[in-house]
Amino acid sequence: MSSPNYSKQLNKTSKLFILLIIILVPFFIFLLRLFSMQIKQGSHYRTQSNAISSQVSVIPAQRGEIFDRNAVLPMVINTDSFAVYVTPGEIPSERYDTVIARLANFLSITKAEIDNKIPKYLRRSYSTIQVKSNINFNTIMNIAENKTDLPGISWGAKPIRNYLHTGSLSHIVGYVGDITKDEWTVLYNQGYTRNSIVGKTGIEKQYDSLLQGNPGKEISTIDVHGKIISEKPQIIEPKMGDSLVLTIDSDIQKLVEEALGKRVGASVVLKPSTGEILAMVSYPFFDSNIFNQENSGIEFNKLLNDPLKPLINRAVQLSYPPASTFKIVMSTAMLQENAFPSAQAIECKGRMVYGGHLFNCHVKYPGHGWLDLKNGFAQSCDVYYWTIGRDNLGIEKIASYAREFGFGQSSQIDLPSQVSGLVPTAEWKEKKYHEKWLGGDTMSVSIGQGYMEATPLQLANMVAMVSNEGVIYKPHLLKEIRDPVTNEITKEIKPEVLTESTIDKAVWKEIQEIMRYTVTDGTPQYPMHNDVVQIACKTGTAEVDQYKDSWHSWLVAYAPYDAPPEDRICVVTIVEACNTWEWWAPYATNIIIQGIFANQTYDEAVKDLGFTYLTKKRGRME
């Protein structure tokens, strides 16, 4: 039998043993875990300890395609191409210059060109820098075959724009190019990168945000030096840009291009009931694809320095004296203001003397004789409108009606860099030249000369207002936005009123009648005669200081005269004075109208209109 003291001692020892186990077991577990972390998984955790952030690389989205109004075949697509990138930090410093020189040789550029894109302070950076784009597959293959000698060099797909329909569409569609430093400064917070391709002109620029799409992302884990350490990055796929369907009809565009020919000028075909632009041609034009070429900078400078200014869209970016086409505004103002009875005649003796200056009508002495409004308009008598402007309206009323027609202000068409033209007033002249407005100034403006200026599109809007009897719809080139995958229409552009006049309906009817009378009994009877459709029009001949005995030729028209506005088109053509045959505007306009309503090609329209024998000047048409 054990003693009580022994039992107590044993019990105490057991408790100490249990306590020791409780203490030692977690300690040994901790030691084993520490051994595992330091020895077995040490490299893993050391990597994790250095992984302080993620690097996000942008995957460019395919740019959206552009279609004409029929949305069948694209006018602009993307073509496979590549870009080459340098990650400077991956190149051993002692080999940097050798690697870059070798890469430059493969890319057919100089080492200095690459050095300009990678300043010395970036040479240890692990950021990826694009050094060249628009590289063909063969060049990429050559680089790939020498990859071991080119550390830090990578490449990726970077499609280029392929403009399938060049020529006159260049001013409408525009072109793209690498984003500039100034552009990136403005756009960087909208998802653009230093490697982005952006629209430079035309639709490409106007709707760049829609065409860009949503770029994808490649997310990689990087260490403290910026070096990628993740084996497999996370990929977020890009979404292609929206497809844009334009209001342009490719067949009509081609017809207008051929009708204008190689004559410096512009022509616009507009649907007055909606504001849709069916065709817009400015000559000379250019090939948008040249900006994809190696020597694009050289070609751009050639275009920039060309005296005929092929980069300018004359339909919206140049303004001209509207000449006698402005007599539409003058006649409207006269009728609405009851400034002078339309049936009362004014005598034209071929000239007027005012302020010590002799003003000659285009029909010299003895002049047109006695003319009422209808015949004064149809014969485009300057004496008639000089009298109305100076004695019956005055510059303030003339300017007010000009602005009501949309002159002197933006047409708000969806194209960048348009001009507003000019509606001069006495106040404007005082501010501009510090000179008093004279009666002779009013006379000049009354026939669309002097300081008065307008774009071809503004004149198309003027004709649209006559056709619509007081309404101008906002001119536009975008018809629809479509999903690039499903082709579903996501947005349709609705007609939007730009200007609505309070001029009496009876006034519009009379203006329409005298425009029709101009075709049947006025100055352009021969070039505007048409058996297919009734045309209403007005000619214009603008004097140009730098050209002696040469003039800008205008023709503004709508057709059919006897149809409702929704079935009509408006056509405006200007042929500049620098052409060998500047009188072509009426002929070109009639060819366009004939081709559209007879569903004919240019050659067929010319033949049916009997214009094939025209080989010399026909004479001035006011």
PLM ranges: what are they?
Residues 1-295, 319, 344, 396-404, ...:
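Periplasmic/cell-envelope proteins involved in peptidoglycan metabolism and beta-lactam response
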